A protein has these predicted regions:
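Conserved beta-strand positions in repeat-built beta-propeller and related beta-rich domains
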Residues: 37-47, 99-103, 140-145, 216-221, ...
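Blade-level signature of beta-propeller repeat domains, shared across WD40, Kelch, NHL, RCC1
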Residues: 334-369
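Surface loop/turn motifs at the tips and blade-to-blade linkers of beta-strand repeat domains
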Residues: 66-70, 79-83, 118-123, 162-165, ...
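Residue-level detector of Asp-centered blade-edge/turn motifs that repeat once per structural unit
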Residues: 30-32, 93-95, 132-135, 210-212, ...
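Loop/turn-rich, solvent-exposed surfaces of beta-rich toroidal or solenoidal domains
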Residues: 248-249, 253-269, 273-340
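Short loop/turn segments that connect beta-strands within beta-propeller blades
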Residues: 57-59, 110-114, 152-156, 228-231, ...
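Blade-loop segments of beta-propeller domains
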Residues: 64-108, 114-131
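Repeated scaffold domains used in trafficking and secretory/extracellular systems
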Residues: 21-26, 72-90, 125-131, 171-173, ...
Length: 369
């Protein structure tokens, strides 16, 4: 984060501390009966890095939990101080089954979180968000190797893989070079260190979405939404830098979480531009959630900037996790909480806090109706 961004963040946090935000709306409208969400715990040991949770949304009661961690193969040493292999990433509810991504495997559960099996492959490396299709396949964003890979859910076979760093047009547009990779090998534990992610060509492809028979990817290292099928940059916007999650509505409207800007951003893919921003700090419920953590965050952040500490700092209101149910958006934040926002009005209509530990963040979200 540069000095100007840090100064603006400090001003925003001062506003959060000093002023009240907008109240919750009175009417909640139609809500799903159940949600599933995954958590990631910053700087935790691998075995304590996160879990999959099923929540009765109406009653705000947790009905089942399951720890999520990389196993078979297990990770004995994670060189990333934040915990690169930790927790439960993207999740999807598909045909009566919950799919939950660990670092290199899709864990498969029933609605009560009884484990039904796994799907893993040598090209599943640093998984983030996933997308299921009506054809019975699942796309995974294999972030560590900048690939989008499709698998058949019934057989586990690989259907196809898209490699944006190898597409000539994207190489010219974004200045990319292919990743040195043996695609036939088991790469699941070969990219734990920072070398590949520090490369200038690294895209950090962390979300995939299928729309009009095309596959789109969020490449946040280059602040871009990319048509992976045709190899074209559809949108470039500063809000995409470091962003997470990608939903595309039938009309071509794309939604993503501006993780550091603490907002949900809306893009018109046809016009290639941002058309709306929903600032999550406008809501008083959110301000009350993060106020207790802001003073300690800045104390630790100043110490880190001064070189007095080197460990990772958990940021209040780190935005991850996004799904849609009718006119409502469900947005995940830290400390691990879920916001229900009326898409048409921008009002906060409901919310739920799972943990007050600022290190715990929601990552994946799925409606189970």
């Amino acid at each position: 984060m540069d000095l100007a961004s840090a100064f603006q963040e400090a001003l925003d946090d001062a506003d959060v501390m000093l002023r009240r935000g907008a109240p919750r709306a009175e009417g909640r409208g139609e809500s799903p009966a159940r949600l599933a969400f995954g958590t990631v715990v910053r700087a935790a040991p691998v075995e304590e890095g996160g879990e999959l949770v099923v929540l009765d949304w109406e009653r705000k009661e947790v009905t089942a939990t399951a720890p999520i961690l990389p196993r078979e193969p297990s990770v004995e040493d994670d060189p990333n101080p934040r915990g690169n292999t930790r927790g439960c990433r993207g999740i999807r509810w598909h045909d009566g089954e919950l799919l939950a991504a660990s670092y290199h495997t899709l864990e498969r559960y029933d609605a009560s979180l009884h484990r039904r099996g796994t799907l893993s492959d040598g090209l599943m490396v640093g998984l983030h968000e996933i997308e299921t299709t009506e054809a019975g396949t699942v796309w995974v964003s294999s972030t560590a190797i900048d690939a989008a890979v499709e698998y058949d859910l019934s057989t586990g076979d690989q259907v196809r893989a898209l490699w944006p760093r190898e597409h000539p047009h994207l190489q010219n547009t974004l200045g990319l070079e292919p990743l040195a990779l043996d695609k036939s090998a088991d790469n699941r534990l070969r990219f734990l260190g920072p070398t590949a992610s520090n490369d200038d060509s690294h895209l950090h492809l962390n979300a995939v979405a299928v729309h009009d028979d095309r596959v789109f990817g969020l490449c946040n290292a280059h602040a871009a939404i990319v048509d992976l099928t045709n190899g074209t940059v559809v949108v470039q916007d500063e809000a995409l830098q470091g962003g997470h999650n990608l939903l595309i509505a039938p009309d071509g409207t794309a939604l993503m979480n501006d993780t550091y800007g603490r907002a949900v951003c809306v893009f018109d893919l046809a016009r290639g531009r941002r058309v709306r921003t929903i600032d999550l700090t406008r809501y008083e419920w959110v301000r009350a959630l993060i106020r207790p953590h802001i003073p300690s965050y800045w104390k630790e952040e100043v110490a880190r900037k001064a070189g007095w500490r080197a460990d990772s700092i958990a940021r209040p209101l780190f935005v991850r996790g996004l799904t849609r149910h009718g006119d409502h958006l469900f947005v995940g934040v830290s400390p691990a909480s879920i916001l229900q926002i009326d898409w048409t009005t921008g009002e906060l209509v409901d919310a739920y806090c799972y943990s007050t530990d600022v290190r715990v963040c929601v990552h994946g979200l799925a409606v189970m109706d």
